[in-house]
């Protein structure tokens, strides 16, 4: 669920529309604005390569955010993601703690 929430923030937020993604046609560090097709890629080239797994694709986009020049948009987006992850950790810890206490008292 946390992975889904993180992807929603990165892909769905208007604040992230200036992030850069790597070109699918090569392994070089060519940056292409998200939402634009690569000028160098073609269907014949892309069909010969194995499609990346969703996790790898997500990690590549995440890494490119750090490589790209820091903008207010990307900083804001990652601030939201970090808060969501931190908040999820805290709620998990407190829930586990209270459940353990209740189980011990009932015995």
UniProtKB/Swiss-Prot annotation:
The keyword Transmembrane applies. Residues 23-64 are annotated as: Disordered. The chain crosses the membrane at residues 76-98. Residues 37-57 have a biased composition (Low complexity). Keywords: Membrane, Transmembrane, Transmembrane helix. It is found in: Membrane. The keyword Transmembrane applies. One of its GO terms (cellular component) is membrane. It comes from the Eukaryota. Its main location: membrane. It is a single-pass membrane protein. This is Putative uncharacterized protein DDB_G0286831.
């Amino acid at each position: 669920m946390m992975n889904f929430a993180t992807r929603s923030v990165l892909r769905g937020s208007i604040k992230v529309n200036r992030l850069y993604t790597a070109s699918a046609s090569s392994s070089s560090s060519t940056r292409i604005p998200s939402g634009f097709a690569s000028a160098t890629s073609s269907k014949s080239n892309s069909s010969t390569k194995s499609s990346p797994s969703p996790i790898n694709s997500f990690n590549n986009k995440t890494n490119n955010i750090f490589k790209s020049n820091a903008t207010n948009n990307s900083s804001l987006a990652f601030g939201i993601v970090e808060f969501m992850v931190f908040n999820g950790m805290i709620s998990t810890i407190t829930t586990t703690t209270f459940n353990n206490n209740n189980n011990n008292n009932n015995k």
